A protein has these predicted regions:
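Glycine-centered loop/turn positions within well-structured domains
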Residues: 63, 82, 98
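Conserved short histidine dyad/triad with adjacent acidic residue
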Residues: 28-33, 44-60
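A short, N-terminal "cap"/entry segment at the start of jelly-roll beta-barrel domains
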Residues: 1-41, 127-141
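Short acidic-glycine-tyrosine-enriched beta hairpin
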Residues: 79-95
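Glycine- and acidic-residue-biased ligand/ion/polar-headgroup-sensing regions
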Residues: 63-64, 68-73
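Short beta-strand His + acidic residue motifs that chelate non-heme Fe in jelly-roll/DSBH
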Residues: 56-57, 75-76, 92, 98-105
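A short hydrophobic beta-strand segment most commonly corresponding to one strand
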Residues: 91, 106-124
Length: 141
């Protein structure tokens, strides 16, 4: 079966409305099946863990990749805790519990998260519930 041909797409992250989870985390969906119009596209989220906060963590049914854009923090991977910093890529296999901790820093920890299936992302579901779609610009209500 031939894949649906898509036009090139550019997304300005600064113009994507964040979904805010309390004071600790902001999530911006910057690429997904709804934006591109094709179900098999890689999902990309821009996340910011605010300085002084930690996230609860989860284990997913799909592999996930973190690319640390900036900042420093800790990442729990099952029973191991590693230091994370800008420029680092972390592969998180399916079933691995992972949690980001930015409590020891005075700067935000910014990451890109990549995964295959949009159905395995809690923030995606929260966006649909709140906005009726996965992506909003800052110019929308």
């Amino acid at each position: 079966m031939e894949k649906k041909k898509l036009p090139p797409l550019s997304v300005d992250v600064a113009k994507v409305k964040p979904l805010v989870f309390g004071e600790e985390y902001e999530s911006r969906m910057i690429l997904d099946h709804a934006i591109t119009g094709r179900d098999d596209v890689i999902q990309i989220n821009h996340g910011t863990v605010k300085a002084g906060y930690a996230l609860g963590g989860a284990a997913h049914e799909e592999d996930e990749i973190y690319y640390i854009l900036s900042g420093k923090g800790k990442l729990q991977l099952d029973d191991e805790i590693i230091d994370v910093y800008g420029g680092q890529v972390i592969f998180i296999p399916a079933g691995c519990f992972h949690a980001l901790d930015n409590r020891g820093s005075d700067e935000d920890l910014c990451i890109l998260t990549f995964w295959r299936d949009w159905r395995f992302n809690d923030a995606y579901e929260a966006r649909l519930k709140l906005w009726g779609k996965s992506f909003k610009t800052i110019d929308e209500d």
